Design a protein with these regions (language model features):
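Transmembrane helix boundary and interhelical loop/hinge segments in multi-pass membrane proteins
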Residues: 56-59, 78-97, 101-102, 109
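Residue-level signature of transmembrane alpha-helical entry/exit and packing/kink sites
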Residues: 15, 29, 33, 65-68, ...
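Long, hydrophobic alpha-helical segments
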Residues: 64-85
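Selective transmembrane-helix segments that form parts of the transport pathway or gating/packing helices
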Residues: 102-130
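Terminal transmembrane helical anchor/hairpin motif
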Residues: 2-11, 33-37, 42-61, 144, ...
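Hydrophobic alpha-helical transmembrane segments of polytopic membrane proteins
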Residues: 73-79, 149-174, 232-245
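Membrane-interfacial helix-loop-helix connectors in multipass membrane proteins
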Residues: 129-153
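Aromatic- and glycine-rich beta-strand/loop motifs that create alpha-glucan
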Residues: 1-34, 175
Length: 257
């Protein structure tokens, strides 16, 4: 794929999106990371499905446990999509070609968001189908024909996309790969393990929302957020961080501000 000649500084959204797509698909780390997410979610889904022994438990929720690994991979990808340009210095060329800095972030968000949503849903559905096939005899076999199961699987894929966008936003805010990755790991993974899970704020932590709401087909005791409300909260996190990233990208120097 080639990008048609566009005068320097006059990229429109369509041209900028094509350029971003080329950059994204030529990042070797993207392909490997997506393969890791797919393989990991399938493997965990199979193990969780086969090892489920409680016939009254939420089998679907168990099978979707691989979403924790998947969300880490997608968070890393989001960080890399943004910080790779800062580490290589190509962000200056990008901003020279697209002086409207909000457009730069909008394009990255749109292109990566579409890729993350499609691949996140694919990995989640693959993990679920593989895990469901290995559920033992005597344990209820979940099926996509069940509305609550289809909702849980679909929202789990959307969760991966949103965590990836959170990673992208933090990458734009921090501009350093290791620091941005540390920030997203703390927000998504460390906070639930740091005692916050038992506090009133616990139900607003991304990973707990995923485990107890988005990926659940049965109400979880003590967790009052509905699946759609949980997804809305995660989307708000991503939106607020992306807004902050857009403001910072527009107000400071490309590399040193």
């Amino acid at each position: 794929m080639t990008v048609g000649a566009v005068p320097r500084g006059h990229y429109r959204f369509r041209h900028a999106a094509r350029m971003e797509w080329i950059k994204l698909r030529t990042l070797r780390s993207v392909k490997w990371a997506l393969l890791v997410a797919l393989a990991g979610m399938i493997g965990i889904g199979i193990a969780a499905g086969h090892n489920t022994i409680n016939a009254r438990g939420d089998v679907t929720n168990n099978i979707l446990a691989g979403g924790a690994l998947g969300s880490l991979v997608f968070a890393v990808l989001g960080v890399l999509v943004m910080t790779s340009e800062y580490s290589s210095g190509t962000i200056r060329a990008t901003l020279a070609a697209i002086p409207r800095r909000p457009l730069v972030l909008a394009v990255k968000t749109a292109v990566f968001g579409v890729v993350a949503l499609v691949t996140g849903e694919a990995a989640t559905f693959a993990g679920f189908l593989a895990g469901a096939a290995f559920v033992r005899t005597g344990i209820p076999h979940p099926a996509l024909s069940q509305p609550t199961v289809l909702r849980a699987v679909g929202l789990s894929g959307a969760f991966l996309c949103l965590v990836g966008l959170i990673g992208l936003a933090l990458g734009a805010i921090v501009r350093h790969g290791a620091a941005a990755l540390a920030a997203v790991v703390v927000l998504v993974f460390v906070a639930p393990l740091a005692g916050l899970a038992q506090t009133p704020a616990g139900k607003f932590l991304p990973l707990l929302i995923y485990a107890n709401s988005l990926g659940a087909t049965q109400p979880v005791s003590g967790f009052t957020l509905s699946p759609w409300a949980g997804l809305g909260i995660i989307a708000c996190y991503a939106a607020v961080l992306l807004a902050a990233a857009g403001w910072l990208l527009s107000s400071r120097d490309a590399l040193t501000g």
